[in-house]
From Swiss-Prot:
Protein name, entry field: Adenylate kinase
Record SUPFAM superfamilies: P-loop containing nucleoside triphosphate hydrolases
Amino-acid positions noted as binding ATP in the UniProt annotation, renumbered to this chain: G10, A11, G12, K13, G14, T15, R123, T132, Y133, Q202
UniProt keyword ATP-binding present: yes
HAMAP family with a match to the protein in the record: Adenylate_kinase_Adk
Stretch list, region NMP: 30-59
Function of the molecule: Catalyzes the reversible transfer of the terminal phosphate group between ATP and AMP. Plays an important role in cellular energy homeostasis and in adenine nucleotide metabolism.
Family statement drawn from the similarity comment of this UniProt entry: Belongs to the adenylate kinase family.
Subunit structure: Monomer.
Keywords: ATP-binding, Cytoplasm, Kinase, Nucleotide biosynthesis, Nucleotide-binding, Transferase
Pfam families, A to Z: ADK (PF00406), ADK_lid (PF05191)
Transmembrane segments: none
Gene: adk
Amino acid sequence: MRIILLGAPGAGKGTQAKIIEQKYNIAHISTGDMIRETIKSGLVLGQELKKVLDAGELVSDEFIIKIVKDRISKNDCNNGFLLDGVPRTIPQAQELDKLGVNIDYIVEVDVADNLLIERITGRRIHPASGRTYHTKFNPPKVADKDDVTGEPLITRTDDNGDTVKQRLSVYHAQTAKLIDFYRNFSSTNTKIPKYIKINGDQAVEKVSQDIFDQLNKR
């Protein structure tokens, strides 16, 4: 099973991706995670990527396709994979097609912008472990402190209000066009891929079940 997970920043793609990965025993390929690892490396490329993300812009198609191509060639992708964060542009989608990356399902997690802004700006992260909190929806026991270690929580530099609005603007201007691209592709291609739209403004478990229901009946 090969799945592309679409949705704006903060729509819950990462959470659902991990659940789908475990449910269907497929590899979760998150370009966001791979980019953050590159940034943590301290290399020149990582520094350049950080500047791009801090400005609320998208990483180049060339870089994204390169890391995805390398990743899907690994053995753990033989049973299938889920792409989280790619493609974000039509050129990326076209490049994946040229590489012969056949997709079975496109799942869009749909959430309104005002809710996305609230979700993202309230996020707090424990850098060492990656544990994630939210000031409203999942607050730590002590404000701005990790529940396990008591260490300070941080806000990602790209999670501030202005940057979030810019990211959503970029999403709607570029990434959202993929919805139409794949919807049209699905309507004219009887084989693959199949387009599925899911209401993301629900409990995590309900979103997951809606996704499973759609995948299992096709």
